[in-house]
């Protein structure tokens, strides 16, 4: 009996030893490059490579001119707005305009976050007057229109005090030149510290309304944690802690008929829409307006948005290195996906049927990586054929 137990124990030990030997004897090799992998979508073309300051915005005019902007966030920025000419970026409209006037914040360009061509021979420059995300300089946050025929400034609209808060960061804009005697512009406030909002301004008078102030649709999703390249994007929190980056209403697009405004907070995966008729009507209360906003569901986390003349809406998806397209029937499809699309930022549709967009590795900035700047130059302006025209503005 004793011998039987010993024999059984020896057999068990032998089997275990053999299994262990087989396990340790297995040979591991580096994963072959030929192993099944994520497949890119869309044929991307590089329009320009940036080896200096990081760009955020791009716009393509009705004649094909391309403008970009460089906010003053810490990089060396000799000019905050430029035009790509003959393969180089040059200050626009000139170097002098790109310098802050300390005596008059409403004069020179301080820190431009967005550039948008209005389809009627002008390019508009959106000046945050908030370098480094500081509080905007009093009287400095403004819209500047440049005539494309003369390359001269033809209009300055300083945002009135009733729409600019201490934490305001005007981010992006869209124009409807059919509404009002000279048109209407819609601007997102993507505040990092205060309430988000949509600013509605009459171009003729400069009169402005602050709408959806602090509404759920313009605010940071409190449960949202952005994950890019497999890593949570964190910023400074209270008492030296780190917390998910919180940026309010950012991307914006206007439907081809001007009746619907699409928008989304950067720190959210939802797309929202509201009727511009209600947005422009000061008699509609904030509660009524907030109740009229449509939540169109998840689209991925976006920085920039854009709309085409066929009724589609395009949205960057920075967590998945992608651009998505919402068809008029509400269905979504991915039109571009590539591991090199590190943070698709602003989108713009050119007259050539291409979707142009900036890729700038925004999430690799030092303030999101405990002081370590992980960006690798160049940043890129890319384009993708979509066979669609931009949504009309007039």
Region spans (language model):
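Blade-loop segments of beta-propeller domains
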Residues: 87-132, 136, 155-163
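Asp-box/WD-like beta-propeller blade repeats and closely related beta-sheet repeat scaffolds
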Residues: 133-188
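Short loop/turn segments immediately following beta-strands, especially the blade-tip
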Residues: 203-208, 274-285, 386-390
